[in-house]
Every structure is written in structure tokens, then in C-alpha cells.
Amino acid sequence: MSRDVQNRVTYMVYCVSAFAMHFGLSMKQAYSYLNNFKGIAFLDECYEAEHQLSIKETVSDLSVICHRNGGALI
């Protein structure tokens, strides 16, 4: 696995964990929610910008993206 891919995976796991903690979800629930409402795709597509933000800002961005795609958590 290349270093870039490894960094992206580590970052995504960290973001899913932070999202889960923020909303009181399990990791599995958080991943399913983010995957269903395009949060995972957003993290992958916007990695270069998002990984430079604080985790609080990233969780907020994920919440907005998922809400725009039908998610209920705000």
C-alpha cells in the first residue's frame, strides 16, 4: 500500500471515529451512515483540503454533506 493511500485510510478511520463520538454512534453505525449519505465519498474526494482542517470542522462538514444527501443528523 502506498504512503498516500495509507494516510487517507488512517485519516478516514479517524474521521469516522470522531463522527461516531460526536453523535453517540458505534463505529459501524457511523460508517454506514457516512457511506449511505455520501460522507465517505466526500472525504475521499476532498482529502487534500479536509485533512488540513481541525477534526471539529471536518465532522461539521460531514454532517452538512450527509444532511444534503438525506441524512438526519445535524
Label each residue range with its predicted role:
Residues 1-74:
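C-terminal alpha-helical interaction appendages
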